[in-house]
Amino acid sequence: MKEGYVIRNQDIPHFLTFTVVDWVDVFTRKVYRDILLDSLKFCQEHKGLVLTGYVVMSNHIHLMAQSKDGKLSDLIKDIKKFTAQKILKRIVEAGESRSDWMLKRFEFAAKSNSKNSEYQFWQVGNHPEEIFTEKFLWSKLNYIHMNPVRSGIVSKASDYLYSSASNYVGKESLLDVSLADNPIINPLKSSGFDVDIDLW
């Protein structure tokens, strides 16, 4: 990991990205998305994870996360380890149609990392960025929520089930999040906050 992208302050919120090795599109399958969300929910309820925003895409996930206990790095390690083990187990045992191809990619990636015994699911590193201003917070929330729109999956961010955009517009959602305080009534770009609120 580059020196500029490390978690120096374990107490404050960070923008994080977890990416599947070789950008393999694992999360096109609902079963794997649900494993990921179940893990996040467990960590919210039992390990002090605070989420302000998230989105699950086909091969990566963005989070705006904080640890109540000042142990963000430990939380990340737990989430990545648990989800990797459970998803890999499911791929092996459930007859996933792409299993041979995916497992070969994960096996190849593991050979370059001595910490892995057989397979590596997640890329090393999380590209952490400290959330230090309201403007930065809202720009990252906008970036997270607009991922499915930019990818052509939905036309409005809140229509995408696997993100926190629905939380911010009062719709039903899969995960509870700690909503960021909206610093202005309508955070449009002209206000200085780079948020495409009309597309949420």
What does each of the following model-derived ranges do?
Residues 1-200:
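Short catalytic/metal-binding and nucleic-acid-binding patches
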